[in-house]
Regions:
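Mid-to-C-terminal alpha-helical segments outside catalytic/metal-binding sites
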Residues: 233-257
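Structural preference for beta-strand elements that scaffold enzyme active sites
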Residues: 2-4, 33, 78-82, 104-107, ...
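Acidic, metal-binding active-site segment of PIN/NYN-like and related structure-specific nucleases
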Residues: 221-229
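An N-terminally biased module of ancient metal coordination in phosphate/nucleic-acid-related enzymes
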Residues: 1-89, 98-100, 160-170, 174-175, ...
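Alpha-helical scaffolding within the catalytic cores
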Residues: 91-95, 205-206
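Domain-core and long-helix interface of multi-subunit machines
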Residues: 101, 107-216
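Short aromatic-enriched loop/helix-cap "lid" or pocket-rim segments at secondary-structure transitions
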Residues: 47-48, 94, 119-120
Length: 257
């Protein structure tokens, strides 16, 4: 069975293709399960408008579109409605309301510390050791809520780091120990792997990270992190990820629901 629970839509402002294009591509790529997990529609306290996620007013359209595709393609592929989101203490209740309104699952992808409207993208500041540890702390807090299904790109912090330093090890230990204790998978991110294989490296998946964290024996799930339907047809990237993880001795899982 081939599952992917990390699929975006154009509502996030940095993806291409229609929602149905992703479903058709998933069928072409041999997927049995496709989960849409676009960036969460945070309702910020300030007038700030995000450049990288749907607006709160787009949630209903997103939900209705995914559910309509779920019915249209029933019997061909199982489709699920989810969101990728950070853990923000002050906005946590918004996720509970989205869950009550039909969101089937959340994946924990920490892109901003504390709140997007007041802080830069973590990939650009995690070269600073204190920021990296705060990133790890916030990720651990999210894990311990029990709300999220898995941790997306846990090694995102290597984006602007050239060496896997002792602080990087400490952050990895914090995240992977918490995920292990919670029985929560961590994601091997295929968008990052695609970048590496096409000479546009993003810094993750990071080989040193994945070798180092083997000691925690985490469950690992593949996430296409699709922002283009073509990514779901790319079997070379998928197969490469499986081979790498198998070589390192990681245990793959493919379901969260």
């Amino acid at each position: 069975m081939k599952h992917n629970f990390h699929t975006h839509t154009t509502r996030c402002k940095h993806a291409i293709g229609t929602d149905e294009d992703y479903v058709k591509a998933a069928l072409d790529g041999g997927f049995d399960v496709l989960g849409f997990a676009d960036h969460a529609p945070w309702a910020f306290e300030t007038p700030y408008v995000s450049h990288c996620r749907m607006l709160p007013t787009q949630w209903t359209d997103y939900k209705q579109s995914v559910l309509a595709l779920k019915e249209k393609y029933r019997g061909q592929i199982d489709i699920h409605l989810g969101l990728e989101c950070e853990h923000y203490d002050k906005y946590f209740d918004q996720l509970l309301r989205l869950r009550d309104d039909g969101c089937e699952y959340f994946i924990l992808g920490c892109h901003f510390l504390y709140s997007e409207e007041n802080n830069p993208y973590v990939g650009e500041i995690n070269h600073l050791d204190d920021t990296l540890l705060r990133y790890a702390e916030e990720t651990v807090k999210g894990i311990r809520t029990g709300l999220y299904a898995y941790v997306a790109h846990p090694d995102l912090y290597m984006m602007h780091r050239e060496e896997f330093t002792p602080v990087c090890m400490e952050a990895a230990d914090m995240i992977c120990q918490a995920a292990k204790e919670a029985g929560m998978p961590i994601e091997y991110n295929l968008l990052g792997l695609l970048g590496e294989m096409t000479h546009h490296p993003r810094g993750y998946p990071n080989a040193d990270f994945w070798q180092y964290i083997r000691k925690w024996d985490n469950d690992v799930i593949l996430g296409v992190d699709a922002h283009d339907p073509a990514q779901l047809r790319n079997e070379v990237v998928w197969d490469t990820a499986i081979k790498r993880l198998d070589t390192l001795g990681h245990r793959l899982v493919n379901h969260i629901l």
